[in-house]
Amino acid sequence: MKNNNSGKTSLYPEEKEEKILVDPYGRKVTGLRISITDRCNLSCMYCHNEGADCCSCGSLGHEMSPELICGIVREAAKFGVRKVKFSGGEPLFRKDFEEILACLPPLKEVSATTNGILLEKRAKTLKAAGLDRVNVSLDSLNPEKYGKITGAPPGTLEKVIKGIDSAVEAGLTPVKLNMVLLKGVNDNEIDAMMEFIRPYGGKVILQLIELMNIDPQLSKYMIDSKALEKILEERASEVRVRHLHHRKKYIIDGVEVEFVRPMDNSEFCAHCSRLRVTADGKFKPCLLVHDNLVDVREAKSPKEIEKLLRLAVSRRKPYYIPATGVTKLEKWQE
């Protein structure tokens, strides 16, 4: 078991099955995805704000304190949560991010998803505070196209690339480049992105992400995911399958490529092991469901956090269910 914070020992006995959080569909919860801010310095055309309704997006007042964030993680770790991913908004907008990282219990992996703009100057301090690795959003290597997708001013792409270099140098690896595929915009850049990461020698992975079509205006940008999967398989010398969401990893000419397909994908839901936490302190059982949130800010003690955590897990339900209508995980996998 990895120990992120020197001198600390594991808080949770690995072998005690009764400690594991399991939802009504048999899925174990072993990870948290925590949004620590809604603030961001980009306005990406496809952004879903981590499923938030964003009535208070951009507001400092509603963000969780470091104490609450760490309290949530400590309680979750007692019940089998091994991995935590921090997101936003842009998590590096939190000047106290290092403070948050430093107070976490020992975990298998602590990661963050960032747009990379502020990463160059903080990569080393984030690593020292306990961050293991980062995902960096990079949808295009073309400055003009990057600006069109993200709303970023000229010169931003160069900052992101410097941030990636700094992350690799600091040991925040493997760095995963999140590339949301947009038909007719950047879907012709996959090979260029693969060549971009090749010099990093396996320390950077390309993660292709299917557009989440939650806005009718985005429908025209949806790619043919099955066709792309077929091409990737044909070109790959090796195909591996990750447990998380049953994702496929393709080794193509020595470069590692993942393809994340969340839309209309019952396999994605069947293997989902994460519980989300919104920036304003609510457990969110599913990214695409908005009426079953659990407000953890009401908790006045660790025991109350545990109670609300269990309530949120009990509300987890797969958004996409196989056409058979079978909803028990063990049946899905037969």
From Swiss-Prot:
Its cofactor is [4Fe-4S] cluster. The keyword S-adenosyl-L-methionine applies. One of its GO terms (biological process) is Mo-molybdopterin cofactor biosynthetic process. [4Fe-4S] cluster 2 binds at C269, C272, C286. One of its GO terms (molecular function) is GTP binding. It comes from the Archaea. Residues 24-256 form the Radical SAM core domain. [4Fe-4S] cluster 1 binds at C40, C44, C47. Its EC number is 4.1.99.22. It catalyses: GTP + AH2 + S-adenosyl-L-methionine = (8S)-3',8-cyclo-7,8-dihydroguanosine 5'-triphosphate + 5'-deoxyadenosine + L-methionine + A + H(+). It is an enzyme of class 4 (lyase). InterPro entries: Aldolase_TIM (IPR013785), Elp3/MiaA/NifB-like_rSAM (IPR006638), MoaA_arc (IPR013485), MoaA_NifB_PqqE_Fe-S-bd_CS (IPR000385), MoaA_twitch (IPR010505), MoCo_biosynth_MoaA/MoaC (IPR050105), rSAM (IPR007197). Pathway: Cofactor biosynthesis; molybdopterin biosynthesis. Gene3D superfamilies: Aldolase class I. SMART domains: Elp3. GTP binds at R33, K85, T113, K176, R274, L275, R276. Disulfide bonds: none annotated. Belongs to the radical SAM superfamily. MoaA family. This is Probable GTP 3',8-cyclase. The gene is moaA.
